[in-house]
Swiss-Prot record:
Subunit comment: Component of a complex containing fem-1, fem-2 and fem-3. Interacts with fem-1 and fem-2 (via N-terminus). Part of a E3 ubiquitin-protein ligase complex, at least composed of cul-2, elc-1, tra-1, fem-1, fem-2 and fem-3; mediates the ubiquitination and subsequent proteasomal degradation of tra-1. Interacts with sel-10. Interacts with tra-2.
Protein's job: Required for male development. In XO (male) animals, fem-3 directs male differentiation in all tissues. In XX (hermaphrodite animals), it specifies the first 80 or so germ cells to be sperm. Negatively regulates male development when bound to tra-2.
UniProt KW keywords: Developmental protein, Differentiation, Sexual differentiation, Spermatogenesis
Organism domain of life: Eukaryota
GO-annotated biological processes: cell differentiation; male somatic sex determination; masculinization of hermaphroditic germ-line; positive regulation of gene expression; positive regulation of meiotic cell cycle process involved in oocyte maturation; positive regulation of oocyte development; protein localization to chromatin; regulation of germ cell proliferation
Name of this chain's protein: Sex-determination protein fem-3
A cellular component term, taken from the record's GO annotations: protein serine/threonine phosphatase complex
Gene Ontology MF term list: protein phosphatase binding
Organismal lineage: Eukaryota, Metazoa, Ecdysozoa, Nematoda, Chromadorea
Length: 409
């Protein structure tokens, strides 16, 4: 007996099973798409590990799941605000040192270092990336609390509202001219904060409380400008360097947001699941972190009467007791990074140790044999010189005895 809930199979007149080829083709296409997604995810994960050699971010510091074969990013990472430049750059030829170059420019704009100080740049970049990952972890846990698996505008609001000064700066940055008649927005988070401004009176009061927050902002800006006027007067007067002040990780040129660099910055952060164009907010927070680090380093040196530009030790000592620069989160800056993909062990052979003699052996055997050939050639030249110029005076061996007994022997 066949149960009633089981559908009978379709067969033809000869009893052969009828198979719907359209369903098979659709399943094959879905399988191919899934394979492509997993392949792209593996490539992104390898690039994340490649960038982590500079950023110091490990998979143990990330709270959103990564080891599941595909990314959690569902919404488009970029939108109308970005310049479509994916075809201009090639991923396999794009150097990861670009992150350090941008960090060096931002540190230079903060007045805290020269453009060519690699150690300071690496220190600032690693501290900035670790702070951003901690912010993403905070927002991801908020999203999970609200039964969501993607960070959206509400989570950003909960993070930035922890600090009224930063929330004031955020509103002034992304809502420069609030207009109730505005209807077009490039992304959802601008639309959300635009409505919040007109619906929440507290938000409007915070937005217009310039007298309270401007002195704090101007204090940092004045100190950085003084540093530039003392050590970089040509940069301040040259209009060719105006784009430096607008440079960021997703805007390396200083003129427009780059979609290609936004994806690379997202991969370096560990691919957090973000709502569309929220990468702009993380990029803005990165600039704030670097500016805050630079200002605190300058203040630390001013308090001790140090002159000149800060060195690496000044950065390390100034940040020794500092925590989260923006939102007072509990961030551990001492955790050592771990690698996601272990590189194969490379065995390298070295020549055996040779004791030092009268003739110092070089580090490589090729140089040693060349030196021996030169010495032998020099000996042959000396012998031929003696034979040609002193043929009638052969050399005579003279024995010298120190005791008479040796002579008899």
């Amino acid at each position: 007996m066949v149960p009633d809930d089981v559908e009978p199979m379709e067969v033809d007149d000869d009893g052969a099973l009828i198979v719907d080829l359209n369903e098979t083709v659709e399943e094959d296409e879905e399988t191919k798409k899934e394979k492509k997604r997993r392949k792209r995810f593996r490539e992104k994960l390898k690039r994340f590990d490649h960038y982590s050699q500079f950023s110091g971010i490990s998979i143990a510091q990330i709270d959103w799941p990564l080891i599941q074969g595909r990314s959690l990013q569902r919404s488009p990472l970029t939108g109308q605000s970005f310049n479509a430049d994916e075809n201009i750059f090639r991923i396999d030829e794009w150097p990861r040192e670009t992150f350090l170059q941008i960090t060096s420019t931002l540190t230079f704009c903060a007045g805290a270092a020269l453009l060519s100080n690699e150690k300071i740049t690496l220190f600032v970049f690693q501290r900035t990336m670790k702070t951003l990952v901690a912010y993403c972890n905070f927002m991801y846990h908020r999203a999970i609390t609200h039964n969501r698996r993607q960070i959206n505008r509400i989570d950003v609001h909960e993070l930035i509202s922890r600090n009224p000064l930063r929330f004031h700066m955020f509103l002034q940055k992304f809502l420069p001219h609030p207009d109730i008649n505005r209807t077009h927005f490039n992304n959802e988070f601008l639309y959300y904060f635009h409505n919040l401004y007109f619906q929440d009176e507290t938000c409007r009061l915070l937005y217009h409380d310039v007298a309270r927050y401007s002195p704090i902002i101007n204090q940092q800006g004045t100190r950085m400008s003084l540093q530039h006027q003392i050590y970089y007067p040509d940069v301040m007067r040259n209009p060719a360097f105006d784009a430096l002040w607008f440079t960021s990780f997703i805007n390396p040129s200083g003129y427009s947001f780059s979609r290609f660099h936004a994806y690379r910055f997202h991969e370096a952060l560990g691919m957090p699941p973000l709502e569309s164009e929220l990468i702009i907010v993380l990029d803005w927070l990165a600039k704030l972190i670097i500016c805050d680090i630079g200002y605190k380093v300058l203040a630390w040196r001013d308090a001790r009467g140090f002159q000149g530009l800060p060195d690496l030790l000044s950065f390390q000592m100034a940040m020794l007791e500092e925590g989260d620069p923006l939102f007072d989160l509990d961030i551990d800056y001492t955790a050592p990074p771990t690698r996601l993909f272990s590189e194969p062990t490379r065995f390298q052979t070295y020549p055996k140790f040779q004791p030092r003699r009268r003739i110092d052996f070089p580090s490589r055997f090729d140089g040693f044999y060349k030196k021996r050939r030169l010495e032998r050639g020099l000996e042959e030249i000396q012998e031929s010189f003696i034979m040609n110029h002193f043929p009638t005076k052969p050399l005579r061996t003279v024995y010298v005895y120190t005791h008479p007994e040796e002579r008899r022997r």
